[in-house]
């Protein structure tokens, strides 16, 4: 039998740690549930005029559609957002994305994420945490040492401390790590998980969109009672100022892993729904309600049936009207014939005492008026009968083609009449159809050239006459009694004439 002696304590401790780590990794992860009332993210992060749903903002915080700017890049500013609803579950996980940008290597006071018993309003100064009952993850960028800045610290106040409480009542630092979260090309992500009295803070660098997370602080055992509030705050100092933006704050409740609920197939859900409806129908039939027993008619089919019955009623009424109008027309014809017979008999029979002229004329006028009215009524009845008969005929019969033929013949007659009127209209001699009344270009240029030649001939002739008169004036010294020459033209001619010897003397 092989016997092992001299096993060192360090090896035993290492093996124990490996066993514990393997057992921890073998445990299934907790079940997560998204809590929308404790979360916010873009786009449309804030409702215009109403703020963030289920959250309140304080101080210099500026709400946008994509992010919450806790503090702008101005000195001595502070702002915060706090949840209006408390945390009702014992274990939770928060995923936060933020961006801190500003000039220089040294930043402002930084950003702090809180889980406290009571809600505060503004500020991220560490000294104020002593009066709070909670913890805070403090992203500090105000350290004077550039090499050690920025730093992430996990702080706790009275009531939420380690089980081995020191009793001094001051702020305790549970852990810290150095990560540069200022001026990153992508948002800086932080994951805070509280599960089974263990707090873990994991960070991503923000150099790429999917940087791997690294554990910054892992503290246990730590007891955090439910009923607290989440908050995020930031502040700037007197020396430097950064823009502090929170892009998203997502909260998840954690529960013990259990047997997964197998979702029912879609067909089973349909069967259950149909079975429930069948039971409801049976219950209604048992009560004897007629409305439930008679299935409702299809509204579209019902509308079509009503339309069909209405059409039949209309056609029946129109046929009755047609028959009544035809009978009325026959009665009118008989009445007209009877009145004509009576009128002829009254003309032939003459009383012994003679006719009264006024009475006879009045009687004849009344008879003519009555006959005319009867004729008009007969024509109106005939028109109504023909209209009703046409309406009664079904669509697609030959009478439509007869009507179209009649309309086309009328249009042809109108067009022929217009053509005849146009042909009979008087036209000037030499008029051609389609000829234009505008002047041709060649004729216009010919007259323009003729006018130009005449103008130049007139100017040349006038100039020769003027030169001739001036020569006579210079030779004789006397000017004929002609109309006075224009002074400007005379001076121009004199300038062009040479000086004679007599004028020089």
From Swiss-Prot:
InterPro entries from the UniProt entry: ConA-like_dom_sf, Intracellular_Lectin-GPT, Lectin_leg
Keyword Transmembrane: yes
UniProt-recorded name of the protein: Protein ERGIC-53-like
Keyword Acetylation: no
Organism, as annotated: Mus musculus
Sugar attachment sites: 84
Domain of life the protein comes from: Eukaryota
Protein's cellular compartments: Endoplasmic reticulum-Golgi intermediate compartment membrane
Pfam families found in the cross-reference section: Lectin_leg-like (PF03388)
Entry's Gene Ontology molecular function annotations: carbohydrate binding
Disulfide bond positions: 177-216
